[in-house]
């Protein structure tokens, strides 16, 4: 551990896509600079309220809302609340007195970054997706460095100092052993499928995945499933798999994602930036179904990073039918080497040192002046 005091403030959150990379960086910074060297500013309703304290970090929250998709009155109220949120954030920033700030996106990042800029604190902004959002494109003008996760994204920040770092993943995920696909799936060594749909699950997976897998099991295909599902559907889906002869675990939240990835031969998931980074880090082949309502269709762009190098497969939601999935998994069972190859290619895309690269860059910014 470095004994030189260095305090990092991380601003933003809301979803796992913003938080998990932030936590990966926070863990590395804490290793280098000590227990109380990281502080978070987030929103009052986001996942940060559970994940940040559980990871052992301090968190303060701002009353800031969402601008998109909730009607003009809501947007006007949100805009009206931004100035008070900036003043609230300014007090939080002054109390923690950080040496450097990292913005990670989410609604709380804007007032916190504006406050930090007003205090002359060096800042970096991390863009997780292959298509930068409007908020981050605007906030990039407050930051001295923009850090991106995908090739080509720096072009979306013209005139800004920009570096490709990759998207940090938690250390436990980076340590998942390489994929080892058998030459033949058997009852003793079945095809193991991991299904998840983000922090709220994905109802289309709850419907279509069992519709595809149960006929395969009836024809003797050896399959195991671990599936994240909305809490209201977990018990019914568990019974459905059990009655169809498939060994399955259905759960609203997968606590140990590293073990879940380690045990998976195939992943079926959305293609948020964190999921794509985790698929690469763990070297797991995947069928990615982009969330169709993601801003600027950024999930499809994220998935394309792996699809373009044959490190996974993408299927649009309107084309993700159970008959197609049944046929596709049948082909994978007949040719397991396809899974091995896709997993190895996916792992070649990983940037396992993204967290350390970001920490080193942030540390170098401490003495920078605007």
UniProtKB/Swiss-Prot annotation:
This entry's Enzyme Commission designation comes to 2.4.1.227
UniProt-listed Gene3D superfamilies: Glycogen Phosphorylase B
Does the UniProt entry include the keyword DNA damage?
Answer: no
Q: Which residues does the annotation say bind UDP-N-acetyl-alpha-D-glucosamine?
A: 15-17, 129, 170, 199, 254, 299
What reaction does this catalyse?
A: di-trans,octa-cis-undecaprenyl diphospho-N-acetyl-alpha-D-muramoyl-L-alanyl-D-glutamyl-meso-2,6-diaminopimeloyl-D-alanyl-D-alanine + UDP-N-acetyl-alpha-D-glucosamine = di-trans,octa-cis-undecaprenyl diphospho-[N-acetyl-alpha-D-glucosaminyl-(1->4)]-N-acetyl-alpha-D-muramoyl-L-alanyl-D-glutamyl-meso-2,6-diaminopimeloyl-D-alanyl-D-alanine + UDP + H(+)
Q: Which GO terms describe its molecular function?
A: UDP-N-acetyl-D-glucosamine:N-acetylmuramoyl-L-alanyl-D-glutamyl-meso-2,6-diaminopimelyl-D-alanyl-D-alanine-diphosphoundecaprenol 4-beta-N-acetylglucosaminlytransferase activity; undecaprenyldiphospho-muramoylpentapeptide beta-N-acetylglucosaminyltransferase activity
Q: Give the first-level EC class, as a single word.
A: transferase
Q: Which PANTHER family match?
A: GLYCOSYLTRANSFERASE, UDP-N-ACETYLGLUCOSAMINE--N-ACETYLMURAMYL-(PENTAPEPTIDE) PYROPHOSPHORYL-UNDECAPRENOL N-ACETYLGLUCOSAMINE TRANSFERASE 1
Its family?
Belongs to the glycosyltransferase 28 family. MurG subfamily.
Protein name as catalogued: UDP-N-acetylglucosamine--N-acetylmuramyl-(pentapeptide) pyrophosphoryl-undecaprenol N-acetylglucosamine transferase
**Species for this entry:** Magnetococcus marinus (strain ATCC BAA-1437 / JCM 17883 / MC-1)
- Gene transcribed to yield this protein: murG
